[in-house]
Regions:
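A short, charged helix-loop
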Residues: 1-18
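Alpha-helical interface subdomain recognition
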Residues: 16-153
C-alpha cells in the first residue's frame, strides 16, 4: 500500500521529521525542569554558615536566570508544536531549537556548578539528567545551522 507519492510524500516526511524534532525539544525542556527542581531542592537542603545555601542572593539570582531561560525554551517548544504544519512552522521550530540549545546547556552546567562536586557523581540523579540534556543537544543538531535558517527567514 502506497500512502503518498511525489511531493505529498516529501511533505509528509518533512512533517514527520519536524514532529520528531519538536518531541526531542520537549523531552529536553521537560528534563531541564526536573534538573531545575532537583537543584532548587538541593539549595534548600544544603546548609553552609548556618543557613540553606539557597538563601544566598547570588545563588538565588542564578536560579532565577535559569528559570527565565527554561520558560523561554518551554514557550518556544509549545509554539513550535502548535505551528508544526503552519506556513511559518519551520521558522518557529528553528527558533525553538536555538533556544533549547541555549537553555539545556546553561541549565545543565549551572546545575552541576550549584551542586558542587557531588553534582558530577553517579550518586545523584542530576548527573545522569545532565548527561541526557547534553545528548539531546547533540541529537537536535547544530544550533548555528538552525539560527542561520531562522535568520534567512
Amino acid at each position: 500500500m502506497v500512502v503518498a507519492q511525489g511531493e505529498a510524500a516529501v511533505d509528509a516526511w518533512r512533517l514527520a521529521l519536524a514532529a520528531a524534532r519538536v518531541g526531542r525539544i520537549a523531552e529536553g525542556v521537560g528534563l531541564a525542569r526536573t534538573v531545575l527542581d532537583a537543584t532548587a531542592e538541593y539549595l534548600r537542603t544544603r546548609r553552609q554558615f548556618g543557613q540553606p545555601i539557597g538563601r544566598f542572593q547570588a545563588l538565588a539570582h542564578r536560579m532565577a536566570d535559569l528559570a527565565i531561560l527554561h520558560e523561554q525554551a518551554q514557550s518556544l517548544a509549545w509554539a513550535a508544536a502548535m505551528k508544526l504544519d503552519a506556513a511559518d512552522g519551520a521558522r518557529t521550530l528553528d527558533a525553538a531549537q536555538v533556544m533549547a540549545h541555549r537553555a539545556l546547556r546553561a541549565i545543565g552546567q549551572e546545575a552541576i556548578q550549584l551542586h558542587g562536586g557531588i553534582g558530577m557523581t553517579d550518586e545523584l540523579a542530576v548527573s545522569h539528567y545532565v548527561k541526557r540534556l547534553l545528548a539531546i543537544e547533540v541529537e537536535l543538531g547544530d544550533a548555528d545551522t538552525a539560527l542561520a535558517r531562522f535568520a534567512a527567514g
